[in-house]
């Protein structure tokens, strides 16, 4: 069974909830990542020289890009059944030394952030849709 129209709609609608407070959710997202993988801090140019996770234009832009890429993955999975990356998105992850465990940490942070943004709209079905979309993106990044 492919990615369904309902799954795509769930990802799209909840990604809009993230956009309602991107500063707060961006800080939450990276805080969760660094709690789980403190050494990942050096992989992010906008975090490596800071004392902690603080809101900044670069942090917010990167978080919005990550969540946007997962949303775009949902669209691609629904349309074609696979995720194809644009440009250098895959190679930059290889250059930064991103390994399989990092993808697991980011997935967990992504789901916790969307859960927070979704509030009472959160469900197992919503979680599953984000997981499938993220896994499709992660697979494409690893294959690049």
Swiss-Prot record:
Main location as per UniProt: cytoplasm
Key words, A-Z: Cytoplasm, Heme, Iron, Metal-binding, Nitration, Nitrogen fixation, Nodulation, Nucleus, Oxygen transport, Phosphoprotein, Transport
Highest taxon above the source species: Eukaryota
Molecular function terms from GO: heme binding; metal ion binding; oxygen binding; oxygen carrier activity
Alphabetical list of InterPro entries matching this protein: Globin, Globin-like_sf, Globin/Proto, Leghaemoglobin-like, Leghaemoglobin_Fe_BS
Binding, O2: 62
Protein purpose: Leghemoglobin that reversibly binds oxygen O(2) through a pentacoordinated heme iron. In root nodules, facilitates the diffusion of oxygen to the bacteroids while preventing the bacterial nitrogenase from being inactivated by buffering dioxygen, nitric oxide and carbon monoxide, and promoting the formation of reactive oxygen species (ROS, e.g. H(2)O(2)). This role is essential for symbiotic nitrogen fixation (SNF).
Protein name: Leghemoglobin-1
Gene it is expressed from: LBI
């Amino acid at each position: 069974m492919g990615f369904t129209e309902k799954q795509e709609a769930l990802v799209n609608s909840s990604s809009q909830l993230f956009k309602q407070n991107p500063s707060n959710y961006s800080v939450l997202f990276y805080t969760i990542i660094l709690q789980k993988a403190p050494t990942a801090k050096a992989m992010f140019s906008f975090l490596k020289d800071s004392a902690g996770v603080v809101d900044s234009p670069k942090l917010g832009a990167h978080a919005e890009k990550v969540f946007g890429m997962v949303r775009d993955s949902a669209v691609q999975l629904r349309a074609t059944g696979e995720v194809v990356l644009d440009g250098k998105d895959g190679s930059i992850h290889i250059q930064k030394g991103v390994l399989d465990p990092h993808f697991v940490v980011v997935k967990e942070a992504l789901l916790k952030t969307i859960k927070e943004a979704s509030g009472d709209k959160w469900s197992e079905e919503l979680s599953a849709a984000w997981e499938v979309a993220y896994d499709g993106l992660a697979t494409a990044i690893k294959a690049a």
